[in-house]
Amino acid sequence: MVDHARAARLAKRIQTIVATAIEREVKDRRLEYVTVTDTRVTGDLHDATVYYTVRGRTIDDQPDLKAAAEALQRARGQLRKIVGDQLSVRFTPTLSFELDTVPETSAHMEDLLARARARDLELAELKKNAQPAGDAHPYKDDDAMND
């Protein structure tokens, strides 16, 4: 029987442990700009997927995603050992790392919404000065009203 609450608690704890270990214990400069964003644990508690983002050295720099992925793969065993030492579970989950695409997806959605808002404002401006084509009341019959 799967205990989802326990899996969620374990995932949160693994996320904290891995983030702290990357910051303080793993000595790899390629992980300086890595941020752990989320962790998911399978129902049997044997596998954990750690989601991460990478930022550049400055705002204008592109992040080195490949180097960060290689560094995480290289440090995977060390991180699993650290997780195992700090968790009180019978089996230490295997760790896998995946780049978190949520920030890029949300930025794309924000861009689409901004374009839609701009188009709505443009149409509202055009509508202010617009005149109806034809009569103001095209379905009214003036002759029928005079009878």
Curated annotation (Swiss-Prot):
Record's SUPFAM superfamilies?
A: Ribosome-binding factor A, RbfA
Q: Might you name a Gene Ontology BP term for this protein? A: maturation of SSU-rRNA
Q: Which GO terms describe its cellular component?
A: cytosol
User: Which intervals carry biased composition (Basic and acidic residues)?
Assistant: 137-147
The primary site where this protein sits is cytoplasm
Q: Which HAMAP family match?
A: RbfA
Q: Which family does it belong to?
A: Belongs to the RbfA family.
What is the role of the protein in this entry?
Answer: One of several proteins that assist in the late maturation steps of the functional core of the 30S ribosomal subunit. Associates with free 30S ribosomal subunits (but not with 30S subunits that are part of 70S ribosomes or polysomes). Required for efficient processing of 16S rRNA. May interact with the 5'-terminal helix region of 16S rRNA.
- Name used for this protein in its record: Ribosome-binding factor A
Q: Lineage of the native species?
A: Bacteria, Bacillati, Actinomycetota, Actinomycetes, Mycobacteriales
